[in-house]
Every structure is written in structure tokens, then in C-alpha cells.
Amino acid sequence: MDASIGDPRLTSVEAAFEKNPLPGFSWLVTPRAMAVAVLLGIVFCFVGMRIQMMTGFVPALNMPVTVLSFFLLKVLARQLQKWRLTVVPFTRQENMFLITCVITCLNLAITGGFATALTGMGTIVAKTLADDLDPRDIIDYIPTGKLIIYFFLIGMAGVLSNIPLNQIMIIDYQLLFPTGSVIGHLINSFHTPEGAYIAKMQVMTIFKVFFGSFSWSIFQWFYSSGSGCGFSSFPTFGLELYKRRFYIDFSATYIGVGMMCPHIVNFGLLFGAIISWGFLYPYLETKHGEWYQTDSPSNLDGLNGYKVFISVTLIVTDGLINFLILVTSAAINFYHIRQQQQQTSGLASYISKNPSMNYDERKRIEMFLSSKIPMFVPVAAYVAWTAISMVAMPAMFDQIKYYHVGVLYLAIPVVGFCNTYATGLTDWSVSNTYAKFSPFIFAAWIARPGAIVASLLVSGITMASLHVSSQAMQDLKSAHMTLTSPRAMIAGQVFGVALSSVVSPCIFRAFEKAAKPGAPLGSKDSVYPCPYAGLYRAICIIGMGGVKGLPKYCVELCVIAVLVTIAIDALVLVSQLKGWRLHLYIPSMTVIALPFFAGSYFTLDMCLGGLLLLLWKKIDTMSAEILSAAVAAGLICGEGLFTLPSALLNMFKVLPPMCMKFLPSGQEVEVVDSFLNSSGGTVPKT
């Protein structure tokens, strides 16, 4: 049998593992893998949710998950074998089961709506958009038990809607799923001596940087007693630019995120911050009394209306354009694949008719087909799950009705196919675009008090189910490349959903407790501002027809934003079709739009991270390629994990001993000195 891939001189991957027998189901779904999954699930949910609540988006954490999963499970397996508690060998298949558990857990945590839809239901976010609130459109507290049930319902909807597509996407259409392919190659390499050495080096780097980041967070904490205190409020470029939110807050998280994001994303964010906070908003402030009258920073009929609706317009327009491009591309590719299939009468028969197919592909397809699940099982399960959700969702949230849930669950498999197919082609899930468009439709459909909460629920269900589904297919691609049973992967996805359903609501409660007094979670002054929460709520308001109360020329500026977005996206598309390089230097309009609403401070930290990586690559390219993701993960995890002791200190009323704050010279210092003297304190004279 031919054991080569393309070029006979190249060694087959599966031939290298030929001596290792394929493990059974019980050797894949092991208690030790589940134990490590619980540990890593908690850590990465904590870190991922924290980043999302701080910045509005989460960089790809698949690589840190993959490296740490391999390292921790290998160490645990070796110790258990040393203590003679098990004879089960550590295999790449068990490694893949662990990875899909953790990634599914993380994906559900960051797409379930904690930083978007669920936070957007509360009074804190609602007051940033209006002063006169309808209590039927407000939910300030959702019991933890309800959150657990809600997350399990939407997570399982994503898993069940994905299963019927497994063979179609992986075998019939042979889609690439780039991230899944990379992880598959990585796992295969890790289970060789050379790959294990690199993995060990990466893990050591993560722990070293983690310790430094954690220590830096402790040091910063001592100077942060009070609002606007500490290094996070350091006026790097002076107090005037600080008022415009242009400063470096020395956040290891943002620097790490900047190292993981492409340079075009980092500088796109900075460009958006300069355009909005540097030019547009100062100009609009000069129109106070002419274009708008209110001084309220939250009302949509004031300056806030421009901020919210211009940013929403940019994001939604860019998302819809990219969605149309992806759907068109997917339809064209789908047509060509169907034409090829009609000529070959299906891939299964193609295997038997083409004995020259390389050894790796034949081996992988045989494994996949031998352990696939009959189609009627997931279809029947999804129908039953839809019925359960139609009863459970309205019982927990009376703003949404059973027929709203039924229509949404009917659309999820159809839209999920489009989203997963596009992910297989481009590695890009547009679930967030669907999550912005669906509440607009449902808000217009419901159009009565309570519609905002119902539409936000629709947004959360849409994003979580579609994203979990598409990313589960990425994991299945990795499983296909490592000869891991699809049934074991589905078991891992179910376990990941169950784990996330319990862990992520508890972590969310910890973040609520950790928020500083006077700056609760979701507020603009909070450590966790959840910048997208207001945007999602604003989309629901627009859907209900609430644009009539906007300030003067707001709609016209939104139309200009639409036209600019169309022009930029058209230029990018033409550049791609013509083979120019111009599109490589044009950032996404969604990236540019984020600072319009969230502020500009984090963009400088991210650019700093990107510049550090660029400098590192100039000095030592190989070291940067191997270890940069590990350094970024250490920076993010170190600061992220300090949130736990910080929250505990806050719960027990243990406050930092000092406040480092910067004030302009003159009368302000005298006022502060007078205040401190009346309180028994003093400002040291210099």
C-alpha cells in the first residue's frame, strides 16, 4: 500500500503511527482528560470572558489551549502510570478529545452573551442610551440557575445542528477549515519526540511570562485605591489627551492581545480611535446647542446618539457586505463541488474506484465513515431539543414567546450550514453578523414593550449556536487528521457545553463582584465596560423604529458611514480579485468602528504589543514564530488570573493602600488638599 503523500519521497503521517493501535472509545473519553478539561475550561473561560468584557472581542486562543492540553495531560498520564493507577497510554486521540472539550467550553462562554446581550438587558447599559426606561425592557439580575439552563439549551442547539453536516463538510466537500487543519498537524507533531520538545519550551515560556504578568498586576493594585487611580489611568501623553481617552494603561492583557492580533487589526483600531475621538467627536461637541441640546452623556438625542449609531452602522454594514460576499462565494463553490460529485457518484465510491488515493486520506476516511452517527439520530434529537427550548425559554423569560423560539430554531440549521461552509472556506465565522442582524428583525416583528429583551435573547441564541456549530466542525477537522472517532468528538463537545454552562455563569458572578464601587460591570468607567453591550441594545432600539428621536444630522452621518463602508469594502474586493496587494493594508471597517463607541485607550496598548512582536521578529524570526503565542498567552493569563484574588479582596473590603492620581497644577490641587484636610488626610507639599 502506498504510504506517501503526493511526492513519494515524503513520509506519510499515518505511517509514522502505524505501530500504535487505534484506541477504543473508553481510552479516548477518560476521567483524566475530563479532569484536565475542567481545569483548563475554568482558566480559559475566565481569561476569555475577561478579555471580551474589557475589549469587546477575543483573539484566537486555540493555540494556547492546544499546547497546554498536550502538556498537562501528558504530565498527568505519566504520573498516573508511574503510580500504577492506569495502564492507558497517552494518545493523540485522547489529546483531541481534551482539546474539543476545552475549546467548546470557551466558545460557549464568549458567545453566550455575557459581554453583549445579557449585559445589554441591564439598567446600567440601558441608561447609556436613554433616561426614560420601560421596566419590561430591563432585566438587571438573572439567577445563576436560569443562566445554567439557558447556556445548556443554546450550546446543545449548536452541537446538535452541527452533527448532520459532519460528513458533508469533512468528507464529501473536503473543506479545509484552516484552524482545524493547523491544530491537527500540531497534535500529530506533538506526539513525536521533536514536537514534544517544542511544546515543553512553549509551556515553560507561558509560565515564566505568566509569573511576570501576575506580579505586575499585584504591583499595580497597590496604587489603585479609588476611581481614576493607578497605572491604568496614567496620562501618558498629557491630561488633555487623557480626557480624550488617549493614554497607555499598561495592561498586560491588551499588550498580549496586540501580539496575537494581526498588525492590520491593531493599527486599524488606532486609526478608528484617531478619526473618532481625535477629530469627529471634538467637532460634534462644537455643535452643542445647534444640532443637539442635551448635556446628558447617555441620551441618544445628544452626543451619545452619534457615537452609538455611527458605530452600529459601520459594524452592521460591514458585516452584511462580508456576509453577502461569503454566501456568494460559498454558493459558487457549492455548485462546482456538486458538479464534480455528479461525475464521481459520491466520495465513498470514489475511494473504491481510486486505489491510488494516498494512504493518509484513505486511512482517515475509513476511520470517519466507520464511526459516523446515523442521520436520523441528530435530526430527531434536534427536533426534540427545539420542543424543549420552546417550553423552557418562555418559562425563564416571559418577554419571548414559544413561536419566536420555534422560528429561530427552524432557521439555525439553515443559517448554520451557510456559516459553517463559509468557515471551512475562509476560516472566518460570521456568527456575530447574524447576531446583530437577527435582533433587528425580531425587534421589528415584536414591536412592543419587552421586545428589546426578547431580541437580545435572540441575539445570544443566534451567536452561541452558530459559533459553537462552526467551531465544532473545526475540531472535527482536527479529529479527522488525527484518526479520532467523530463519536468521541461529539462526546467532548457535549461535555464542553455542560462544563461551560456551569462554569461561565459562576465566573460572570465573580466579575460582577470584582467591579469597583461606583463603576459596575457594563458602565463606561468600569474595569469591564462590555463595549458591545450598548451596541446590541441600540440595534434592538433601531429595530423598534427608535430613530426619530436622534440628534440633528445623525441619520445623514449614518448614511455617509454606509457609503464609506461600501466604498472601502468594494475597494478591498476589487483588490482581491485583481491580485493587487492593496487590500493587505486596508483594515476591516468593523475593526475601525469599535473605538468609535468603546474609546481609544486600549488601542495604544494593542499597538504596543504589535510593535514589540514586530521588533522581536526583526531580531530573531524563528524564536518569535515559535514563542510569540506563548508570551502573549502568559501576559493575558497572568493579568486575567489576578482578577480572582482582586475580586476576593474586594469582597472582603480590603482596598489598595494608595491612590496614584494626576491633576493639573493650580486650583484643583488646592481643592483636593482642602478636601483631604477636612477628612483627616494631607497632600504632601513639594
Curated annotation (Swiss-Prot):
Listed GO MF terms: oligopeptide transmembrane transporter activity
Disulfide topology: none
Keyword Membrane: yes
Keywords linked to the UniProt accession: Membrane, Transmembrane, Transmembrane helix, Transport
GO CC annotation terms, alphabetical: membrane
Mode of membrane association: Multi-pass membrane protein
Transmembrane spans: 27-47, 53-73, 96-116, 151-171, 203-223, 264-284, 308-328, 373-393, 405-425, 441-461, 488-508, 554-574, 596-616, 629-649
Subcellular location: Membrane
Key word Iron present: no
Family: Belongs to the YSL (TC 2.A.67.2) family.
Function of the molecule: May be involved in the transport of nicotianamine-chelated metals.
UniProt protein name: Probable metal-nicotianamine transporter YSL4
Source organism per UniProt: Oryza sativa subsp. japonica
Lineage: Eukaryota, Viridiplantae, Streptophyta, Embryophyta, Tracheophyta
